[in-house]
Design a protein with these regions (language model features):
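Short helix-to-loop capping/linker segments positioned immediately adjacent to catalytic or ligand/cofactor-binding
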Residues: 74, 93-97, 163-164
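Non-heme Fe(II)/2-oxoglutarate
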Residues: 1-75
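Catalytic core of non-heme Fe(II) oxygenases with the double-stranded beta-helix
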Residues: 91-157, 170-173, 182-194
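A short coil-to-beta-strand element that immediately follows conserved catalytic motifs
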Residues: 76-85
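An acidic, glycine-/histidine-flanked metal-binding catalytic module
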Residues: 178-180
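Acidic/histidine-enriched, glycine/proline-rich intrinsically disordered or flexible terminal extensions
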Residues: 191-203
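Conserved active-site beta-strand element of glycosyltransferases/polysaccharide synthases
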Residues: 88
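Short, charged beta-turn/beta-strand-edge "cap" motif at the junction between a beta-strand
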Residues: 157-161, 166
């Protein structure tokens, strides 16, 4: 069984299988699909402008709060939540290689829903500052294959990450839950610098 905090400390990322499951996973995934159907593409999303995406959806904010204890256990860090974002990807979407802004110091990318008859869409991650474990990829690049309920936890400001064009399926819901280290250089980004956001775990 993987030692999540140790692996995260040594590599800057770790895969957490089944961080969410059961009826809660079903509920959140169905919510994401329905919101995408009702709202349509978000043209203000500069990374993938023609795909449904949502900042701080209330359901995801509560999921953010719900998973905080698991995130702290997996990383070995005390964390503040910052913000949430999710997309419902479509065929041919591509996420270019990038690093994230300070509010994404510690991030979780969670697979919520896709057609189980379709192949898993990989996430690639690399960070030359960290030692690599060969089982997760060749050289300095890791390839994460996430089933529904699985998550990639990573240092978003340090690890470059990307997804190649989505050819494996037709629709996939993915949520990104972002945190900062309470004792780190970006602690002032708590709540994404929007005071008054609701997070019950630390209030």
């Amino acid at each position: 069984m993987i030692n999540h905090p140790k692996f995260f400390k040594e590599n800057g990322y770790v895969i957490h299988s089944k961080i969410l499951d059961g009826e809660l996973l079903d509920f959140v995934g169905i919510h994401a699909y329905n919101m995408a159907r009702l709202s349509g593409p978000n043209k203000e999303d500069t990374q993938i402008p023609n795909t449904p995406s949502f900042y701080d959806d209330f359901v995801m904010m509560n999921l953010h709060d719900h998973l905080l204890p698991k995130m702290e256990k997996a990383t070995g860090l005390e964390l503040y939540p910052t913000y949430t974002y999710y997309r419902v990807y479509k065929k041919d979407d591509e996420l270019l290689k990038h690093k994230d802004r300070p509010s994404c110091e510690i991030s979780l990318s969670l697979c919520l829903r896709y057609n189980l008859k379709e192949k898993i869409w990989p996430i690639f991650i690399e960070n030359n500052e960290y030692r690599r474990i060969r089982e997760f990829g060749e050289g300095h690049t890791a390839r994460a294959l996430l089933n529904m309920g699985d998550a990639l936890i990573y240092r978003g400001c340090e690890c470059e990450h990307w997804r190649e064009p989505y050819k494996e399926g037709t629709k996939l819901a993915q949520v990104f839950l972002h945190y900062v280290d309470k004792n780190g250089p970006f602690k002032d980004y708590k709540d994404d610098k929007h005071p008054g956001k609701y997070f019950a775990q630390y209030k």
